[in-house]
Amino acid sequence: MKRSLDQHPISKRPNVVVNEYAGAIVSDNAIDETASPEGFFEKYVVARKPVKITAKDASALCPINIARFRVDKILETLPAARKRVLQVEKKHALGFGSGKKRESMTFEEIVERLAQGDESLYLTTQYEEHDYDELNESDGESNEEGEAGDIGKEEADEASEDEEEDELEEETTENEGDDDASKKMLESNSNGDDDPSDASSPDPSIDLENLHDDFDDVADEESFVIPEHQLTQDEVDYRVSSLLQAPLTELYKDKSFPLVPENFRPLIPQQINLWMGACSNKRKDAPDLFSPSIESLGRYVPSGNSSGLHHDHADNLYVLVQGRKRFTLFSPQDAEALRTVGELQKIYPNGLIDYKTNQRARFWRPMRADGAMIGEWARWMIEKEDFKQYSKEQLEKMIENDVPFAEKSNSESNWDPPSFSTVPPLLAHLSEISDERHRESLQNYANKHFPGFLNLHKLEVWLEPGDMLYLPTGWFHEVTSFAEDSASAGAHVALNWWFVPPTGGRDRPYPDEYWKKDYEKTLAAIEYKRAESA
């Protein structure tokens, strides 16, 4: 059964959230700006503080030649990608960001349509096919009109709602006891404890004596193209395309293209992405502002196209190539007031936000502060036979508990990803509403359904081509895209680097070698591909 998030009883239940965030907060409406690399890592990365980087006045800070990635040049820069079929996001609920509607077309066609000002498309991260299935599994029939109602509708009587709530409570209670070992491990990651509990016997259906990577199912020693890292050709290709997301994949051949820009070393990159869309600068027709709801407001903003308010699970360096962008930022300290789709479990000192695995985050897997999934980390520890901190049985229990809710439940969900706020973006931009009656109506709606939101401190950051924004993990952001000042309509283009979120300083940014060893495999894959293409 679907129901409106305005009315959903889960969002009103008391929830004990552990908020250990220890980084920068918003004290006024001005963001730091810098054009200097001096002390950058300590001032911003370690301090978990967003900063606008005005690289057009300090080219040493900009990792790319932005002219090469503008709409009129990008096909020359990425010639091998011309005919590559990519997934583009279609506008949904008056904006982008949810990934609910996607369409396949060649990169060349995407560029041509955006150059012509087609506002209905947005090129974002390229997910694997099974990831699309996870995002869209419960969407049912597509809503051809693109209404925001896919978020949830009131369709049933009160008795049905009470029954569903009771079922969720039973499922949650059943799962609580199984999570103790993983929770202890999460606590250990942030406060130094090293004594997990509940290391009971694992599920006999899980062959924990024969743990291995997915690629090992088809691999033997003869199939490894990089034997020292036990990488097959498939895994080599996968690692390169996962880091350099299509259509950027061919940049592995370009040794001048930085996988980690100078000021962010020694962080480890997770993904490098291309973002492309188009927008008109004229004001749009507004929905009914006298009777606002999540469904009616969707991702409407008076002008531009909105991403929706959300946070990431990685540190972000965002480089604007073309167009204009407005980032509206909220600190991880305010996560509870931002009413995420997912049920908050913990906010780590570095800002990373972890969720409870339930029907509101059906594919969620518990994370450490550095973004490592607990189950995958436990497999790694067993593979290298490291039982100093945790016994083998305790690690096996962590793996057993690492099961997505979707595998335990047939519950229906049409909600956004857990990291999205249910607060409509318009409520962050009420100053743009000129009609006082409309503004008062929206204020009343916000105070009723999102109490405290209008009182939160926020940062507003405008980016022009050549500007960059560093955003630590967990910082909520709503991004509104515009055409450039000189155009009534046009394309907007950006590149971004996502980094594994650090938990320490430059000398020891991560708690162990989990990510370092994984990145060594990716670098080996890139070197292999370079030699292969030479």
Residue ranges and their predicted role:
Residues K2-M468, F476-A534:
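N-terminal accessory scaffold of Fe(II)-dependent oxygenases
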